[in-house]
A protein has these predicted regions:
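N-terminal transmembrane-helix/juxtamembrane module of multi-pass inner/ER membrane proteins
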Residues: 2-9, 28-114, 149, 163
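Multi-pass membrane proteins that catalyze or facilitate reactions on polyprenyl-/lipid-phosphate substrates
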Residues: 5, 9-26
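Alpha-helical transmembrane segments of integral membrane proteins
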Residues: 13-17, 45, 49, 53, ...
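Alpha-helical transmembrane spans of integral membrane proteins, capturing the lipid-embedded, hydrophobic core
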Residues: 19, 50-62, 108, 112, ...
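Membrane-interface loops
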Residues: 68-83, 90, 119-204, 210-211, ...
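Membrane-interface helix caps and helix-loop-helix hairpins in membrane proteins
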Residues: 169-173, 215-223
Length: 248
């Protein structure tokens, strides 16, 4: 990480202070709601706590906006996680066999999650897992039709020499949103709903690994990954209510 990146990290790190104060204040508000008879839960204390929450949120907003405004624009997409993981990417650039192995393993997990969502919807008590997958797919393809992003420099994306059922190695310009991340996160959500928590935790760790992998390989930008995580939770919630409403 260069000196400029280190300075940026320190400046953004300062934003953790108002964020921590905001979270602490929200915890106080929650405690006031669950202990309404406490001396620190009277109306004046509640109003004060709410005012502080608003103040901390505004401080966080203006501080982070100032940091964003101080950045210099450019023709390329800036990605801090690409910068921070550059040593890992460089390591894989010089070790193609290791990079291929990572591609194979990550694609195998995507095949597993995708087939699980389809099978769970087909043979399980509800069609919800498949509907969630369908919602993510439709949203992603709409984004692909409307948005085109430049290929990240030093991207590692190729056919590793082992077939995959769902991963299309021949397509190398489908960035927003990350299909790897979306399928993995949605799979982890459904596994946590259908199985005991250790299985959900294991699936969540795999999903985290998938997200990290596409960043290190430069197969996606950070914005692709973050949007995919949000889209997966939205799709899972939408599918839950939709299937419950229609009894499917």
């Amino acid at each position: 990480m260069n000196t400029s990146s280190q300075g940026t990290v320190r400046k953004w790190g300062l934003a953790l202070l108002p964020l921590a104060l905001l979270l602490a204040d929200l915890a106080l508000l929650s405690a006031q709601a669950t202990h309404p008879d406490a001396a620190w839960a009277t109306l004046p204390f509640k109003i004060t706590a709410r005012l502080l929450a608003i103040a901390f949120a505004l401080a966080l907003w203006f501080w982070t906006q100032a940091l964003i405004g101080s950045r210099k624009g450019g023709p390329a997409i800036g990605d801090a996680l690409h910068d921070w993981t550059e040593p890992w990417n460089t390591h894989l650039q010089s070790r193609p066999k290791l990079a291929n192995a990572i591609l194979i393993v990550s694609s195998a997990f995507i095949d597993f999650f995708g087939l699980f969502l389809i099978a769970a919807g087909l043979f399980g008590p509800t069609l919800r897992p498949f509907v969630g997958l369908l919602v993510v797919f439709v949203f992603r393809q709409i984004c692909q039709a409307l948005c085109t992003l430049p290929i990240p420099p030093r991207m590692i994306w190729r056919n590793p020499g082992f077939p995959s059922l769902l991963v299309t190695y021949g397509v190398a310009n489908d960035f927003f949103i990350s299909g790897h991340t979306a399928i993995a996160v949605l799979g982890a959500i459904e596994i946590s709903r259908l199985f005991p928590w250790p299985f959900g935790l294991a699936a969540a760790l795999v999903a985290f690994g998938e997200a990290l992998m596409v960043i290190v390989l430069r197969a996606h930008y950070t914005l692709d990954v973050l949007a995919a995580i949000a889209a997966s939770f939205c799709a899972a919630t939408f599918a839950l209510h939709l299937c419950a409403a229609f009894g499917i």
